[in-house]
Amino acid sequence: MAKNYYDITLAMAGISQTARLVQQLAHEGQCDREAFHTSLSSLLQMDPPSTLAVFGGEERNLKMGLETLMGVLNANNKGLAAELTRYTISLMVLERKLNANKQAMNQLGERLGQLERQLAHFDLESDTIISALAGIYVDVVSPLGPRIQVTGSPAILQNPQVQAKVRAALLAGIRAAVLWQQVGGSRLQLMFSRNRLFKQAQNIVAHC
């Protein structure tokens, strides 16, 4: 069956967007607010009608992720680009471990379901919800291993609010990696279909 590279690229951009958010948070203590909102919102999309619907139905919501993906595909993998590649691959590895663990998958679904009730009282980007998302990552995803080593400013990374946002972003990255697998993504494409992914991302960015 022919691969749908549009959907694969969108899902891949979802992973890249969370990798970039983690990088921004770790180095600067803050991140692009709109991109963060898109990534967090994707965690609530349990039964989306399309790949794009997971990210709010607008290609522009993934602009940062698409640009990050293009940078990673085109880079020599040094410095910050190497960091982004490492986060991306680590999320893909963790997703495979999650997928193989039915108990963890069920627990993740239950915890995200409970979160919807909290959202009746709190904003998605409130400290309460971000802490809850971070807690889900620590309780459900982290034990599956290996741990994702986040690098950045040690002083910034000691801040509990930054730590919570990083973990919430990583959880959204796992969501995007699950989607990526569902639409036919595979790590082999990063080696053998780089040009195709790059051109597809370029085409989408052109009308963002």
Swiss-Prot record:
Signal peptide start and end residues: none
Cross-referenced InterPro entries: HflD, HflD-like_sf
Protein family: Belongs to the HflD family.
Protein species of origin: Serratia proteamaculans (strain 568)
UniProt membrane topology term: Peripheral membrane protein
Superkingdom of origin: Bacteria
GO cellular component, one term: plasma membrane
Protein name, as recorded: High frequency lysogenization protein HflD homolog
Coiled coil: 91-125
Cellular location(s): Cytoplasm; Cell inner membrane
Keywords: Cell inner membrane, Cell membrane, Coiled coil, Cytoplasm, Membrane
